[in-house]
Amino acid sequence: GFRERRALLPDFRRRAEALYGLPDGEGLAVSLVRNQPWSGYNWYDGGRRSRVDLNTDLPIRAADLLFVLPHETYPGHHLEHAWHEAHLVDGLGRMEASVLGINTPECLLSEGLADLGVAGAQRGARAADRVHDLKGILAR
């Protein structure tokens, strides 16, 4: 189930670190939730920390999980927000950059960046190999 699938996070984190680097002190926690309209959601808590919720009510196929987890975590929303805070807020003192608007043009850009990050992180790893890796994790 979902608990075993979270075993993919260290791999996603390593790939993102190799491609984009990781800001100091970043981290996240993954929670399983119910009764939500989405399959996954990133709640950025600040301090380079995120809480990622995965909805267990919706069926998520193995292939879907190879998109949802990195989209919300590494190199997706979590890493984007952590770097945003590290550079703009902490580095340049732009406190206004600590406000994350919902249903704004910035939100649209964030979705696109998360999708592009996933595509970049998965380049070089054939989808068949990734699904094979996932099947091994799920079989445990």
For each predicted feature, which ranges?
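Short, solvent-exposed loop/turn segments at the edges of secondary structure
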Residues: 45-49, 63, 109-112
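Post-HEXXH active-site segment of zinc metalloproteases
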Residues: 63, 79-106
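Primarily interfacial, aromatic-capped hydrophobic alpha-helices that serve as membrane anchors
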Residues: 11, 34, 114, 120-121
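Contiguous, non-catalytic segments that form substrate-binding/exosite surfaces or channel walls
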Residues: 1-52, 59
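Hydrophobic (often cysteine-bearing) scaffold residues that line and stabilize catalytic clefts
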Residues: 5-8, 66, 106, 110
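Long, amphipathic alpha-helical stalk/connector segments used for oligomerization, subunit docking
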Residues: 111, 118-140
